[in-house]
Every structure is written in C-alpha cells, then in structure tokens.
C-alpha cells in the first residue's frame, strides 16, 4: 500500500531506525531519522513533518517535552508511539496514522485474543478484502509473524487460529481492510 507522507523517526537504537526508514521509503514515504532529542527541538524543521514516530525508549518527561516542543511548531502533527521493535508492525502504525479515518468510519470495529481456543478475533463493520497478520515479540525480543488471513470477509465477527502460543510475549494484530490499516495491541 503506497502512502505519501513525511515521517520523523526518533529512537535510541540506530539499527532499528535504519531498518524502519528503509521499509518506509519502500512504501513511498519521506523519512528522517534522529537519535538526539535536543537536536530535534532546536535544529529540525518539524513543520515539514506529518508523523513523529517515537521508539519505546522515548518515554516519560523526555517524551512529553519533545512532543510539546514539536507540536508548538506543528499543531497538526500526528504522534505514533512505537509498540515494539518489529519493522512491519511499526510501518503499519505509521500507515495507520497517515490514513486512518475517524473511529466510526473504520472498517475494523474491534480486535482481540481468545486465549481459550488460541485464536484472535476481529469484528468488521462491513464486508471487505482483509489481510490479518499476527505479530509477537517473545521474552528474548525475537519477532514472530503469522499471516492469519488474506481475502474477502463479510460483516461481523471472525476468528483465526494462531499457531504456537497466544499467552506469552507482547502480541499485536495488523489488519488491512480495503486500504485501511489498523494496529491492535492484544492484551
């Protein structure tokens, strides 16, 4: 899905930023990377940025100061807090920020995990061509990805079995439905 937009990536680990920047450029986005928060506040033209994507290491007061300083110069800026260092997941989060309609206009109404039968569930407001990808970050910070569905689905609730564990690690679902991308943290 090609999306246009300008993204500023901010994080601690240059290697993660490099992989993410490469993937975003492949999607047609303009990307700048930064690991120095002070430089962003003083030297980066944030008026030319659509999305500020923050890594998980940018938290607390440092995050709040940065977002406030950047939003003071660009009130329309969308901020994405990276859920996990999983490149396809982060790409989906940024695509969601760039293209998401209002909550009521979203095709995907809800998503969740069904621990008892090792599956994930989604609820659609209308029928659509849907791709569902399950991401998991295990306790050793290894990323696991499973394509659960790709094809048409009708309106309503749908369940998809997950191979392996659904109870360990950090879990996420990326759902693409007729050009809309939504990211769901599964708890």
Regions found by a protein language model. Name each.
Residues 96-125:
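Extracellular ectodomain segments of secreted/surface proteins
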Residues 4-14, 20, 52:
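Conserved acidic segment of CheY-like receiver
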Residues 138-159:
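Solvent-exposed serine/threonine-rich low-complexity stretches and specific carbohydrate-binding patches
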Residues 54-69:
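Conserved phosphotransfer microenvironments
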Residues 160-162, 166-179:
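Short, aromatic- and glycine-rich surface loops/edge beta-strands on solvent-exposed regions
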Residues 28-36:
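Short hydrophobic/Thr-rich beta-strand motif most characteristic of the beta2 strand and flanking loop
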Residues 35-49:
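Acidic, metal-coordinating helix/loop segments flanking the phosphotransfer/catalytic sites
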Residues 69-107:
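Ser/Thr/Gly-rich flexible loops in soluble cytosolic domains mediating phosphotransfer, phosphorylation
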């Amino acid at each position: 899905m090609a999306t246009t937009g300008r993204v500023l990536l901010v994080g601690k680990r240059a290697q993660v930023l490099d992989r993410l920047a490469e993937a975003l450029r492949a999607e047609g986005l303009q990307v700048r990377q930064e690991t120095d928060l002070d430089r962003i506040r003083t030297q980066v033209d944030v008026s030319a940025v659509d999305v500020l994507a923050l890594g998980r290491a940018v938290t607390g007061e440092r995050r709040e100061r940065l977002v406030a300083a950047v939003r003071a110069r660009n009130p329309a800026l969308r901020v994405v807090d990276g859920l996990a260092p999983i490149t396809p997941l982060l790409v989906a989060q940024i695509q969601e920020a760039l293209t998401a309609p209002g909550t009521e206009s979203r095709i995907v109404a809800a998503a969740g995990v069904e621990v008892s039968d090792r599956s994930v569930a989604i609820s659609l407001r209308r029928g659509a061509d849907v791709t569902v990808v399950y991401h998991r970050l295990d306790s050793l910070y290894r990323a696991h990805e499973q394509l659960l569905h790709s094809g048409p689905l009708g309106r309503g609730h749908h369940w998809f079995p997950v191979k392996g564990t659904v109870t360990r690690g950090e879990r996420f679902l990326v759902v693409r439905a007729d050009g809309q991308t939504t990211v769901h943290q599964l708890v």
